């Protein structure tokens, strides 16, 4: 079986750099590491069936996860079952139950709604299945053994810092007129992205550097149901028509690339100069827009790195070594969950070619749009 050790080594080296390096419970229902079950006892068999439950395939990162998991699990000698729930919680619950019935020994779950999988995952855990959250936290249940994700609060901080940098570079002197967008409220990452961003932006709002002209500064006001680009564009249309008839919008905090493109399209259609807009996921279309100067930034969270880290955990279980040591933890509402946290990267026009230098396909996109 193919083994991957580079990610775990990087995690060990990065421990001092994580947002919180507190240790966490990884035992079945225990409250502390002192009482935790010995993780070395948690194993899976050679060639185990691994179920991967993704929320949907509507964005580039989830399409990539679907393709990469199928290929990498099969190459490593496992039996993969990879499905997506089309953003419907009932679909995901049924798919996970079917994976259990088909003999999955590991479940990798990117939840549609992190609070709605407790019952089906608790049944899976009772059957001895190891449960790994992928990209998103599984909330309000003991039935999660660890989560692989890029630091969500850090991602939000990076988005906000890039927005401020872009405003200074492209929009002259402060004050700046901005608006705030957030992701889908069912996705636990969306709140964390927003919280991280606001930790950077709120002091600038308070001191007058930034003005949120609409006054919509709460997560509930900024949230975009289901991460739907069309809903984001409709909200941006309304914000512009209601607040910017006689003024320019300078920048927008956007939680991902699809919403960023919707925001920019709305601004163009309203006759506004293109605002400075943040993003997330380094989608190919947004890479083209960054190369051309249309979108200011994105935050790269390479899917391959997430899958590689998940594979290393599965390989560790198959080798009889149990769950590897994590470098972070987070409260899921019931317990502290081990987090295998990876570091995101801000990408702007200034470092675009350097970051993607080894990716021929993306470099072709960049060169076609410079």
What are these regions (language model features)?
Residues 16-21:
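C-terminal motif of bacterial Sec signal peptides marking the signal peptidase cleavage site
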Residues 2-8, 22-370:
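A residue-level marker of the well-folded mature domains of exported/periplasmic proteins
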Residues 12-13:
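Repetitive helical segments and hydrophobic/amphipathic motifs
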């Amino acid at each position: 079986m193919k083994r991957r050790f580079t990610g775990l080594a990087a995690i060990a080296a990065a421990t001092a750099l994580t947002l919180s390096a507190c240790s966490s419970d990884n035992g079945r229902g225990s409250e502390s590491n002192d009482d935790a079950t010995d993780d070395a006892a948690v194993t899976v068999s050679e060639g185990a069936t691994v179920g991967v439950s993704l929320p949907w395939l509507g964005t580039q990162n989830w399409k990539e996860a679907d393709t990469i998991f199928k290929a990498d699990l099969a190459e490593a000698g496992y039996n993969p079952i990879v499905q997506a729930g089309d953003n419907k919680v009932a679909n995901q619950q049924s798919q996970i139950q079917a994976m259990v019935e088909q003999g999955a020994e590991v479940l990798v779950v990117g939840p549609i709604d992190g609070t709605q999988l407790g019952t089906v995952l608790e049944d899976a855990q009772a059957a001895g299945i190891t449960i790994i959250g992928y990209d998103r936290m599984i909330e309000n249940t003991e039935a999660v053994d660890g989560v692989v994700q890029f630091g969500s609060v850090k991602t939000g901080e990076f988005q906000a810092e890039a927005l401020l940098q872009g405003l200074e570079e492209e929009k002259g002197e402060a004050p700046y007129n901005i608006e705030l967008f957030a992701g889908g409220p069912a996705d636990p990452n969306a709140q964390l992205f927003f919280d991280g961003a606001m930790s950077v932006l709120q002091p600038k709002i308070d001191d007058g550097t930034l003005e949120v002209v609409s006054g919509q500064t709460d997560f509930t006001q900024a949230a975009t149901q289901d991460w739907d680009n069309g809903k984001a564009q409709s909200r941006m249309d309304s914000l512009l028509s209601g607040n910017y008839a006689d003024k320019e919008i300078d920048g927008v905090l956007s939680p991902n690339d699809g919403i960023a493109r919707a925001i920019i399209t709305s601004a163009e259609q309203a006759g506004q100069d293109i605002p400075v807009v943040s993003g997330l996921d380094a989608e190919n279309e947004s890479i083209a827009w960054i190369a051309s100067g249309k979108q200011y930034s994105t935050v790269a969270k390479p899917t391959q790195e997430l899958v590689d880290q998940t594979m290393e955990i599965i390989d560790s279980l198959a080798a009889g070594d149990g769950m590897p040591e994590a470098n972070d933890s987070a409260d899921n509402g019931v317990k502290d969950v081990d987090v295998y946290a990876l570091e995101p990267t801000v990408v702007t026009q200034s470092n675009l070619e350097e970051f993607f230098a080894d990716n021929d396909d993306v470099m072709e996109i960049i060169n076609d749009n410079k």
